[in-house]
Amino acid sequence: KHKLSFYSSIQHTDRNSYYGAQQDANAYGKTKDLTWVAGGMYVGNFEKVLFSPATFTAGLEYQNNSLHDIMTGYHRDMEQDVRIASAFVQNEWKMNVLTMLVGARLDKHNLIDKLIFSPRVNLLYKPADDFQARLTYSTGFRAPQAYDEDLHVAAVGGEAMEVRLAEGLKPERSNSFSGSVDWSFNFGHFQSNLLIEGFYTALNDVFYLESLGKDPVSGTLVQERRNGNGARVYGANIDYKIAHGKEAQLQLGFTVQRSRYTEAVRWSEDEDVAAIKRMPRTPDYYGYFTFSSAPLKNFDFSLSGVYTGRMIVPHFAGYIEKDRLEHTPDFMDFNLKLNYTFVLNDHLKLQVNGGVQNIFNAFQKDLDKGMNRDSKYFYGPTQPRTYFIGIKFFN
């Protein structure tokens, strides 16, 4: 069996913005962004490739992004054209208890001189229907270009702060390894599944932001995106699912993770502020759970929660006297949603729903205030306790 497919998409953004501090009348800006992607893919199933049946996949893709960002008050007029031509190929061999996938991707980025070669390997061992183990190796990269978050100008201490790219910025490369075991088992009328996974990612030339102080021309505070020596992200997670038909389902997971630079990096221009090896805004522990149930034919509900562990977060002076590194509390964010469905006729149903997001109002308590606040000093759940209702028609 052979399959050939093509795809394309296009998106245009025309955005007016204001990133001012102290009611600065010159802080208006305009951004135009055009992105389009086109590609094709071939998938073929063969009775034998070398030593076993296999599925072969190959494709080509082209991405183009044209960005023009103007902020006259900050003397910024940035034009960036990103063009990426890619080719990828992979082959998946399916044997009795072993599945092996080997693939590679080749990217030519116009902002990077050399071709980027990204291989990947995946081994799946499945000796029984209810048990499998997997090993994976993959690579990736981030190009030295301006990303959407770099266009936003923060307000710190009543002054604007912007992100710029360092001269000679190199691409960030990653090498990732992971291994997992997946076991499904039943007891009585309950079905359950347990997944245990370990992961390790080595980042080379990792991106980080360093504060440079004020720009002498625009007067804005500047953070520069630079290459660090490297970073390591590693840890383990466990996921468990248990269900009793549609009457009740529970899914929960927990992750232990360490995210560390190999060498300490500076985030503040204040010499009294220590450099850090721990990546900011990355908790060492996080988890989730979801419980859903349909006790009645027309009624169902779900209760979910997200746990976010403690982090370190940079806090720039302005509302506070000096730059400092904050140690945040942990958060447990609970959400409840109720649904009731009315059958209007054979072809139309009406669902009424309502609930509460962040039931116990687990929200940041030390937000900066006033015109001298640090607009980037924000962490934890994105919204306080929120009530909602809604309706949905469907067939």
Q: Positions of the model-derived regions?
A:
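Gram-negative outer-membrane beta-barrel transporters
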Residues: 94-97, 199-202, 224-316
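Outer-membrane beta-barrel strand-turn architecture
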Residues: 1, 44-50, 92-97, 117, ...
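Residues that define the transmembrane beta-barrel architecture of outer-membrane proteins
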Residues: 32-36, 79-85, 115-117, 173-177, ...
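Structural signature of Gram-negative outer-membrane beta-barrels, strongest in the C-terminal barrel
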Residues: 53, 76-202, 255, 292
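Membrane-embedded beta-barrel scaffold of Gram-negative outer-membrane proteins
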Residues: 3-19, 126, 134, 168-226, ...
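Conserved C-terminal beta-signal and adjacent last beta-strands/turns
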Residues: 135, 175, 250-256, 277-395
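Transmembrane beta-strands of outer-membrane beta-barrel pores
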Residues: 10-14, 62-68, 95-97, 104-110, ...
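Face-selective signature of the C-terminal outer-membrane beta-barrel domain
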Residues: 1-113, 191-200, 235-237, 243, ...
